[in-house]
UniProtKB/Swiss-Prot annotation:
Molecular chaperone. Has ATPase activity. Residues 335-549 are annotated as: B. HAMAP family: HSP90. NCBIfam families: PRK05218.1 (NF003555). Residues 550-616 are annotated as: C. InterPro entries: HATPase_C_sf, Heat_shock_protein_90_CS, HSP90_C, Hsp90_fam, Hsp90_N, Ribosomal_Su5_D2-typ_SF. The gene is htpG. Residues 1-334 are annotated as: A. Signal peptide: none annotated. Belongs to the heat shock protein 90 family. It is found in: Cytoplasm. Keywords: ATP-binding, Chaperone, Cytoplasm, Nucleotide-binding, Stress response. The lineage of its organism: Bacteria, Pseudomonadati, Pseudomonadota, Gammaproteobacteria, Candidatus Pseudothioglobaceae. One of its GO terms (cellular component) is cytoplasm. This is Chaperone protein HtpG.
Length: 616
């Protein structure tokens, strides 16, 4: 390409640039953090690729990041000799955003969040933060290994368009020049920039260089302004909590300190250091299938990759941090990581440490654990099914709300449940529903409330899947109160009385069955109900109504099954049927049971007509 070409930004990028320029102003200094981070990543990538291709690094110069200011021209230039980019990569990485990160970033900003600069790094759109302080940005880059001495120049004022042209470029790497706005001149001050680097980028292992002040002002000599050491390699006895908090924030772009951290150095058959953090807030993309991993893997302090599944199971995907080992080859691939003995050993030990730390938090700092559970409880429930080896440990960390709880807050443990079980109780009872309110108000609970039996109220979206695969806790099985018969609840006298009542209602049930033949499998007298006239149940091995709803919402095929209608023989509406079978009343009893399940009626208007008719 010989001539300069003008391109238009993707719509989302234009929106983002407008946001950067006009809204995100509370913490303007983060532009430098973002650009230095990009340069550091570029150097890490070159180090990694050069392990298998040493021709990529031209000469013997040290890989560094240089920051230069020109007060006369009002510019700041950040230069690295990292991997660089091709013209196609410049277009792809800067002109457009292929993933949905920007859209979600824009969508997530409400009035309170507009000034929250930390969201920038979380959504991977940091380059555009340049326009917070600059009214023009120029980027010149040349890909490492390119035989041509030509590079690509990208220029934009952030107003909808950008230009690309081919230019002479002797060195590989990337240089970003910011033309600083008139009212942002503070960032041309040498000490101001050094302070920002010290605050955000001190731990970056790539040396960050700035011109050293000389007495005569003529000699140009660069000095390293960051410590350029691996933070995690320091002795934890020399570190304060504030040091950990600052490192965590710079690593994750989180604006809140973590709940806790685990810093371990292991020496033996496998040598490694791990520094793992448990955040205080859930990330925005925790439920994204393709979310970026939170653990960074280093081999001999060289960044290798981020891969949560290789280093941490999915149910612990919220854990952030670094793992550095000398026992992996530097050219390890993502494929080799899977099943690698070193990685498997580190993973197993790391999981064990995290679970022990959570157990310790739950015991010694219950308030912190309550905060943790509010943010990550749903994810932890996945672990019961995914991590069979640690199932018992995870099960003890689970928290629930029950029919005896004062609120929807999940604070009850399975251990406490089992200890407080009634003498002849043989199961941990639970009910699943779409909402806490639906579970709390379910007619299925009536007999349990009457007999003072505790029931877990499950309304998280993972609960149905969890309990269906849970098995037992301390040899006690879990039992749904909406499935099958409730054996063991009735005394001998109650059983005998129920059998008598059932006989008395045989003819009523027979006539009801004819009316509801296409809608129910069976109708029977209930041992669950004390106040409500009716409810729906399913057989023990059939899919419950809540699971059916979940499957349908996911577009899955659901078996066509009919529920069982249970009626309360002591309710006035049901007693009426002994005198006269009223078809409208029978259908209303069924519709009421459907509604109490949280399911929409197929014909609500017809239901209203029947209700009005019965009232009149």
């Amino acid at each position: 390409m010989a001539e300069k070409q003008i391109h238009t930004f993707q719509t989302e990028v234009s929106q983002l640039l407008d946001l950067m320029i006009h809204s995100l102003y509370s913490n303007k200094e983060i532009f430098l953090r973002e650009l230095v981070s990009n340069s550091s990543d570029a150097v890490d990538k070159l180090k990694f690729k050069s392990l298998s291709d040493d021709t990529l690094i031209e000469g013997k110069e040290e890989l560094q990041i240089h920051i230069n200011t020109n007060k006369d021209a009002s510019t700041i230039t950040i230069t690295d000799n990292g991997i660089g980019m091709t013209e196609a990569e410049v277009n792809k990485n800067i002109g457009t955003i292929a993933n949905s990160g920007t859209k979600k970033f824009l969508k997530s900003l409400d009035e309170k969040q507009t000034k929250d600069s930390n969201l920038i790094g979380q959504f991977g759109v940091g380059f555009y933060s340049s326009f917070i302080v600059a009214d023009k940005v120029e980027l010149i880059t040349r890909k490492a290994g390119s035989k041509s001495k030509k590079g690509t120049k990208w220029t934009s004022t952030g107003k909808g368009k950008y230009s690309i042209e081919r230019v002479n470029c002797l060195n590989f790497g990337t240089s970003v020049t910011l033309h600083i706005k008139k009212d942002e001149k503070e960032f041309l001050d040498d000490y101001r920039l050094r302070g920002i680097i010290s605050k955000y980028s001190d731990h970056i292992t790539v040396p960050i260089m700035m011109i050293k002040a000389s007495e005569d002002g003529k000699d140009i000599e660069y000095e390293r302004i960051n410590k350029a050491n691996a933070f995690w390699s320091q002795d934890k006895r020399d570190l304060k909590q504030e040091n950990y908090d600052e490192f965590y924030k710079s690593l994750t772009y989180d604006f809140e300190a973590p709940l806790t951290q685990l810093h371990n150095r292991v020496e033996g058959n496998i040598d490694y250091t791990s520094l793992l953090f448990i955040p205080s807030k859930a990330p925005h993309d925790m439920w994204e299938p393709k979310r970026k991993g939170g653990i960074k893997l280093y081999a001999k302090r060289v960044f290798i990759m981020e891969d949560n599944e290789a280093l941490m199971p999915l149910y612990l995907r919220f854990v952030k941090g670094v793992i550095d080992t000398a026992d992996l080859p530097l050219n390890v691939s993502r494929e080799i990581l899977q099943g690698n003995k070193v990685v498997d050993t580190i993973r197993k030990a790391s999981v064990s440490r995290v679970l022990k730390e959570l157990e310790k938090m739950a015991k010694n700092k219950p308030e912190d654990y309550e905060k943790f559970w509010q943010e990550f409880g749903m994810v932890m429930k996945e672990g019961v099914v995914e991590d069979f080896a640690n199932k018992d440990k995870i099960a003890k960390l689970l928290r629930f709300t029950t029919n005896k709880s004062e609120s929807a807050a999940q604070t009850a443990t399975l251990e406490c449940y089992v200890k407080s079980m009634q003498k002849d109780q043989k199961a941990i009872y639970y009910i699943t529903a779409e909402t806490y309110e639906a579970a709390k108000g379910s007619p299925h609970l009536e007999i349990f409330n009457q007999k003072d039996i505790e029931v877990l109220l499950l309304s998280d979206r993972v609960d149905e899947w969890m309990v269906n695969n849970f098995g037992k806790f301390e040899d006690v099985p879990l039992k749904s109160i909406t499935k099958g018969d409730l054996e063991g609840l009735d005394s001998k006298e109650e059983k005998k009385a129920k059998e008598e009542v059932s006989k008395n209602f045989e003819k009523v049930i027979e006539k009801m069955q004819k009316i509801l033949d296409t809608q129910v499998k069976e109708i029977k007298v209930s041992s669950r109900l004390s106040d409500s006239p009716s409810c729906l149940v399913v057989d023990e091995n059939e899919m419950g109504g809540n699971m059916e709803r979940i499957m349908k919402s996911l577009g899955q095929d659901v078996p066509d099954t009919k529920p069982i209608l249970e009626i309360n023989p002591n309710h006035p509406l049901v007693k009426k049927l002994k005198t006269k079978i009223d078809e409208d009343l029978v259908k209303v009893l069924f519709d009421q049971a459907v509604l109490s399940e949280g399911v929409q009626l197929k014909d609500p208007a017809e239901f209203v007509k029947r209700i009005n008719k019965l009232i009149n």
